[in-house]
A protein has these predicted regions:
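Conserved, well-structured interaction surfaces
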Residues: 83-155, 188, 205-213
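Membrane-proximal, proline-rich intrinsically disordered regions
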Residues: 3, 20-69
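Sec-dependent bacterial lipoprotein signal peptides
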Residues: 1-20
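Short coil/linker segments at helix-helix boundaries
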Residues: 129-131, 154-195
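Alpha-helix C-terminal capping/termination sites
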Residues: 55, 150, 154-157, 235
Length: 235
């Protein structure tokens, strides 16, 4: 009888250990940050995601709405009212077309900020890997500058670096520079916003200095960064 009791107890302990082991698994549809930033290839996958999100329809319209509000675009008889609220200037606080641009931009910034923080700690085994990692980090800085620039153009008054609105509180945008789901920062000044944009572009220029422009390039190159910087300075 004692032998049967011992066997039962041992079998129960074995099943318990197996059960605990099976429960200790990563989610099948997501990765924790502890395992998502281990290799240069991981960084490449994150970087690919930057470009995928840029194609998001809600944020894409951020580049077209100013045209719809101007005389450069006019609705046809059968346009289906796509962008109609923007075209007719009937924008209200709850207009989803506008809300979604803000929302999608900050989703993109959350990913970019994660990478700007995490990429530098990824180990590299060769000069080639270090070059690749610097390129991906440079693209992350370029993306952050791009998002901030789009947002400040759409949601802030025109900036005059020598004017009276440079240091007025809350005329810029919230400058989220790290990933923090609890952060609720106030808007920065316009001066602070444009200083941050130019700072990020300077980082991108340094890190992408060896990535020459090419016809049909589909990622950030040094030429693209310089073109974006010129656009910012012309504002």
């Amino acid at each position: 009888m004692k032998l049967i009791t011992k066997i039962t107890l041992i079998a129960g302990l074995g099943l318990g250990l197996v059960a605990c082991e099976n429960l200790d698994q990563e989610p099948y549809n997501q990765l924790s940050t502890e395992v998502a930033f281990k290799t240069v290839d991981n960084a490449m996958y994150w970087r690919n995601g930057f470009y995928k999100r840029l194609r998001d329809a809600a944020f894409y319209y951020a580049t077209t709405y100013p045209e719809l509000q101007s005389d450069l675009a006019n609705a046809s008889e059968d346009f289906g009212n796509r962008g109609g609220i923007i075209h007719t200037w009937n924008i209200e606080a709850g207009t989803t077309d506008v809300r979604d641009i803000w929302h999608r931009a900050y989703i993109g910034l959350a990913n970019v900020n994660q990478c700007i923080t995490k990429f530098p700690s990824i180990p590299t085994a060769s000069a080639n890997e270090r070059t690749r990692l610097n390129q991906y980090l440079g693209e992350a800085y370029a993306f952050r500058a791009y998002y901030f620039f789009q947002l400040v153009q759409l949601f802030s008054p025109k900036y005059d670096p020598n004017g009276s609105n440079k240091d007025v509180a809350n005329l810029g945008i919230p400058l989220l520079l790290t990933f923090d789901v609890t952060a609720l920062p106030n808007r920065a000044t316009l001066g602070q916003t444009y200083t941050q944009i130019l700072s990020d572009l300077a980082q991108a220029e340094t890190l992408l200095s060896n990535k020459a422009g090419a016809v049909g390039a589909d990622t950030f190159t040094i030429d693209a960064v310089k073109a974006l910087k010129a656009r910012v300075l012309l504002t």
